Amino acid sequence: MTSNEIMRIFADTAYVRTGGSPEELRCAEYLKSYAESLGLSATLEPFTVSLAAIKEATLTLDGESLPCKGYFCAGDAEIEAPFYYLRNTDAYSLSLCKGKIVMVDGYLGYWMYKDILDNGAVGFITYDGNANYADFDIDQRELRAPLQKEGKIPGVNINAKTAIDIVNRGVKTAKITLSQDEFEGNSHNVVVDLPGEIDQYIVFTAHYDSTSLSQGSYDNMSGCVGLLAMAEHFSKNPHRYGMKFIFCGSEERGLLGSKAYVAAHEEELPKIVLNINLDMIGCIMGKFIACCTTEKDTLAYLNYFASERGFGISVRQDVYSSDSTPFADKGIPAISFARIAPQNTATIHNSYDTPALMRGVQMEEDIDFITAFATRMANAVVCPVKREMPDNMKDKLDIYLLRKRAPK
């Protein structure tokens, strides 16, 4: 795949495609069609996702209405209460949430939500964006399923500049009105199957959905381009192990596509020896990394292999927040490759993730390295990455998947 062909795919898919949306399906069909144009057989595998349509979402602070977006799947409510900005998460600070609409810093994860709920919050406000950027964009957020199980309270998202302003003004009272229709729809995985000489597989994953403001070129059409290029390569070259290329839907909504694939293909999992995941490669700036949810010997192997190839890499053992994780949780060793740019050169999950961040030549270099590594794995007599999950990775998987809380 040439640089020009790579950049054409970025141009063709430069639109927002949130999980479960018509635009996401449009992109799935594009990837399927592109794979078929390469002579590959591709299938769409649907899976159910929760969806919502906001009818009304308002935030009023001390009588002034401010721009906001209501959280999907956070129910219907009209709540007026004292405003409280939760700066710290110690027991005293959390105790002040009782009976209040609480604004929190950063992403509203499961444990933060549980803490404010357990301490009596009646509503919540989050914010995103950057105070140093000119835009007043507001991301569309959702109350994910694990949070819903703890109970629903209404919430809205605002821009960071608005958050600074309301704290600076010393706002006292907040009112949230939220009304929405909640329903179910479909997202899709696109699957390409390349049988090998033996009945064991290496699974390649990359998600193709985006967040609500993003064209998703860097995160993560780049990974999908990598999968297309590798699928084309291995369709023309021998490989002892079979290969499955899975373009995952709804990753940005909680790894829903890879979770759905693992659940729907339980009988296949013992045959999978390795997962190779691509999430954010080929950016103009940044360093190339490999995050290995594997035994530690894999790190040395990758460092040696990169030195042999003359390719710069930073390798670590960890859990990567991407579609590799559901496979690792089933005991399948998983390696995620990415090129991580400094935040002042390329950002994600906002309107600045566009094809302008990408470089065709860098994409080619990254894909060539990953393909070379995959070739070693695919033609090994025995896959050298042990099919076992060390205890330290099991512990990190438990934390990431919310089965236990990280120590403070």
Q: Residues of each region from the PLM?
A:
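N-terminal capping segment at the start of a domain
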Residues: 1-23, 38, 132-144, 209, ...
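Noncatalytic luminal/extracellular "stalk/propeptide" segments of secretory-pathway proteins
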Residues: 8-98
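Second-shell loop/turn segments in exported
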Residues: 14-22, 32, 103-106, 151-153, ...
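Alpha-helical metal-binding/catalytic segments enriched in His/Glu/Asp
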Residues: 35-36, 106-107, 117, 200-255, ...
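Soluble metallo-hydrolase cores and metallopeptidase-like ectodomains found primarily
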Residues: 64-67, 74-91, 139-217, 232-236, ...
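Extracellular/luminal Protease-associated
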Residues: 68-148, 152-154, 313
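Metal-dependent peptidase/peptidase-like ectodomains
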Residues: 199, 212, 248-347
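His/Asp/Glu-rich mid-to-C-terminal helical/loop segments that flank catalytic regions of hydrolases
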Residues: 232, 344-408
